Regions:
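Acidic (Asp/Glu)-rich catalytic clusters
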Residues: 55-70, 92-98, 141-144, 167-168, ...
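Active-site environment of divalent metal-dependent phosphoester hydrolases
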Residues: 17-19, 49-53, 80-83, 109-112, ...
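Short, acidic/polar
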Residues: 22-33, 84-94, 188, 220
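Extended substrate/RNA-proximal surfaces in nucleic-acid metabolism proteins
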Residues: 70, 80-178
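Divalent metal-dependent hydrolysis catalytic cores, especially in the metallo-beta-lactamase
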Residues: 11, 15-17, 29-53, 70-81, ...
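Short secondary-structure boundary/capping elements
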Residues: 22-26, 50, 86, 131-135, ...
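Active-site-adjacent C-terminal substructures of enzyme catalytic domains
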Residues: 102, 135, 142, 150, ...
Length: 221
């Protein structure tokens, strides 16, 4: 098995404990592992809300235990039902407390619910009739004002392009298409080409690539 050096690596999408499902590491274990391999930064993510307060404690722990190591843990917010969905008040607090990444709905995205055989009407709506819902304008403004990263999370490819076009028009500079190869998102190769053509960043997760490779192709050319 090949071993790849991890020094200087930045991972913007890591789930840790505590969580509603068991993860491989808790926050402090991840901090120790990151410092050990010389990682530069990690963004911790949760489907249940925010992690910027946890990231703050990780950085305090790192300084006390490891000294002035060149590693920073960053926090984020996911706009699922626990924070009120597209809730600008919750988002602004998270950004003021240091959240650097804003994910659109994940487990509560309408696309996610539909893919798991649940009622999409129970989800958080981000587009309607080919346009963003009005609440998204406040989300874009806050992301722009705080120069945060906006991730498309578990919304559909069609929704992603609508959202990204509108976000760009609103002045959002940092846009990431989240694990587009994962079967829940299921962006086609042509969709990925379009993303690259519009200079959108795409995030590819090891777990999603492994999971997708074990599945039958889902409409990809």
């Amino acid at each position: 098995m090949s071993v790849y050096p991890m020094k200087g690596v930045i991972d913007m999408h890591v789930h840790t404990n505590p969580d509603l499902r068991l993860r491989a590491y808790d926050d402090l274990e991840l901090t120790d592992a990151a410092v050990k391999v010389g990682a530069r930064a990690i963004v911790i993510k949760t489907h249940q809300g925010t992690t910027m307060d946890r990231a703050y404690l990780c950085n305090r722990y790192n300084k006390i235990v490891h000294g002035d190591k060149d590693f920073t843990m960053f926090g984020s917010i996911t706009l699922n039902h626990p924070v009120g969905g597209l809730n600008p008040a919750a988002l602004e607090v998270a950004l003021k407390l240091g959240a650097k990444v804003v994910w659109l709905p994940t487990q509560h995205a309408q696309n996610h619910l539909a893919k798991f055989g649940k009622n999409p009407d129970d989800g958080v709506k981000v587009t309607e009739n080919g346009k963003i819902v009005p609440e998204m304008k406040d989300i874009f403004q806050l992301v722009k004002d705080y120069d945060a990263v906006l991730g498309t999370a578990h919304i559909s490819p069609e929704e992603s392009f609508i959202v990204c076009d509108a976000a760009r028009a609103a002045g959002v500079k940092k846009l990431v298409v989240t694990h587009p190869e994962w079967w829940v998102v299921d962006m086609s190769i042509e969709g990925l080409r379009c993303s690259a053509g519009t200079l959108l960043c795409t995030e590819h997760g090891r777990r999603q690539v492994q999971e997708q490779s074990a599945r039958k192709p889902r409409g990809h050319p």
